[in-house]
Design a protein with these regions (language model features):
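Residue-level detector of alpha-helix initiation sites
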Residues: 14, 80, 120-124, 280, ...
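Beta-strand->loop->alpha-helix junctions that form or flank phosphate-binding loops
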Residues: 59-60, 97-102, 237-255, 301-305, ...
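Phosphate-binding loop of NTP-binding sites
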Residues: 24-25, 63-70, 77-224, 228-238, ...
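Nucleotide phosphate-binding/pyrophosphate-handling subdomain across enzymes
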Residues: 3-6, 18-26, 110, 140, ...
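N-terminal leader/targeting and accessory segments in enzymes
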Residues: 1-98, 102
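C-terminal helical cap/extension that packs against the catalytic core
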Residues: 46, 362-416
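Short beta-strand "acidic-cap" motif of Rossmann-like dinucleotide-binding folds
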Residues: 30-34, 143, 165, 242, ...
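Short internal beta-strands
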Residues: 29-37, 220-224, 351-352, 371-379
Length: 450
């Protein structure tokens, strides 16, 4: 499969770059098209792909590029599902897949996949699961997926008997055909990220596709507390197992402050360093996954008790003059900001705002009890300020995050928490939200004189 074919890759980025290299190695004729001009692409990637024989088309999507001579269209996850090439490919009966599906079909026999999806908590759960599995089984465990490592990038290092821990996004799920994990995990479903998918039903369907590809020999680990997850997964064929932070169930659950796995105490949540009940749930999901491979409680405790979180996700930055600073730039929706605010019981100052998307900030009100001030930033800052005043909170309005730090010295006191949890995307001012988080962290380091 994928030998001596003519293939169009739509979208460069990490996945397009890695897919192109794999396909060229296998003797395919490869075209890669990206709307961005060449001078805005990664020059090293472009040079390498051109040198190995990839036909590169940048700056537009020419109407005559895609025709019936192509055998496959491989779509980058960020490309809309109604893109003209996608629609034309379907008219011409050209299979439309993604990089994950392609790489999955090229994996050696006997490779297990732990696939983790959901609206929130995917990256944290994937990272914890990988670190536990790697501690237990060493280099036979690999990390891949929507966490910065395309599946095709690890093909040459994976052997039969190895295990891949993958984060899977809804955009990837859109073009799954056969892909499925042996152990699948759903952290939760909510309507936070549906803009790419148009409707919530479509969003859930794409998230669920890999589970509907499973057989009764596979495992689906589900959040028992999330009714949308339970409803969406009610007809899957795989063996369903559950975790719950709210009630004692047959699976992984809490009693007082202890996590149990089918009646066996695994650890106390006081030993989990990352903040919030949502992170307890992420740990529980990871426990369920690794227990399918017989990992001991001792290994789980050793990894989890030393895990300090994923960068940019409620990440502890530092304490300066008794004030704790947290970088939660990945909180690009209301639900994530709710989770952040519920994680602290100290007086809190929150940086809130970013790209205007019509967010309903009123949904934050039940979580605002400990908030002493709001610093409104970004293109939606005036609407954030209006909301803050409506609930009687002090608010300070700045276009840019860095300017908000000038006010902090006047309003923080020892014992406070300052958190960047903007409930907004970053594209109004930043290429990606990680840049916003790095800027926040830099300002904290400057406060400390570093």
């Amino acid at each position: 499969m994928f030998k001596d074919n003519k293939i169009l890759i739509l979208g460069l980025a990490r996945s397009g770059y890695q897919a192109a290299k794999v396909l060229i190695e296998r003797g395919n004729t490869v075209y890669l098209n990206d709307f961005k001009e060449e001078d805005k692409q990664d020059s090293e990637q472009v040079s390498e792909l051109r040198n190995i024989g990839v036909n590169l088309v940048f700056g537009s999507h020419p109407d005559d590029l895609l025709d019936e001579s192509f055998d496959y269209l491989i779509k980058n996850p960020g490309v809309p599902i109604d893109h003209k090439y996608v629609l034309k490919a379907r008219e011409l009966n050209i299979p439309v897949i993604n990089e994950v599906e392609m790489a999955y079909k090229l994996l050696p026999e006997g490779v297990d996949i732990i696939g983790i999806t959901g609206t929130n908590g995917k990256t944290t759960t994937t990272t914890i699961t990988y670190e536990i599995m790697h501690k237990a089984f060493g280099d036979k465990v690999h990390l891949a997926g929507n966490i910065g490592y395309p599946l095709s990038s690890i093909l040459n290092s994976v052997k039969s008997g190895d295990i891949i821990v993958m984060e899977c996004s809804c955009q990837q799920g859109e073009n799954f055909v056969d892909f499925h994990p042996h152990v699948g995990v759903v952290t939760n479903f909510s309507e936070a990220h549906i803009d790419f998918m148009k409707t919530y039903e479509h969003y859930k369907n794409t998230k669920s596709k890999m589970f509907y590809n499973q057989s009764d020999n596979d495992i689906a680990i589900l959040n028992h507390d999330n009714s949308d997850v339970l409803d969406e997964m009610k007809n899957i064929s795989s063996n369903k197992k559950y975790f719950s932070s709210k009630e004692k169930i047959d699976g992984c659950y809490l009693v007082d402050r202890d996590i149990y796995y089918y009646g066996d105490k695994v650890m106390c949540i006081d030993d989990i360093k990352i903040k919030g009940m949502h992170n307890v749930e992420n740990v529980m999901a990871a426990i369920m996954a690794v227990k399918e491979y017989g990992v001991s409680n001792e290994v789980i405790f050793d990894v989890v008790s030393n895990f300090r979180g994923v960068e940019h996700r409620l990440e502890y930055v530092d304490t300066v003059d008794g004030v704790e600073y947290y970088n939660d730039t990945e909180a690009t929706n209301i639900k994530c900001a709710q989770i952040a605010l519920s994680s602290f019981n100290k007086p809190t100052i929150i940086f809130l705002g970013g790209l205007e998307r019509g967010q309903d900030f009123n949904e934050l009100t039940p979580y605002m009890d400990n908030v002493k001030a709001i610093i409104a930033i970004g293109t939606c800052r005036e609407r954030v300020a209006e909301y803050a005043r409506s609930i009687g909170k002090d608010v300070y309005v700045y276009e840019h995050l860095v300017d908000g730090f000038d006010k902090l010295k006047d309003i923080v006191t020892s014992g406070d928490v300052v958190v960047l949890s903007p409930a907004s995307a970053s594209w109004d001012q930043y290429k990606e939200c990680e840049v916003r988080g790095a800027e926040f962290k830099q300002k904290v380091h400057e406060l400390k004189g570093e």
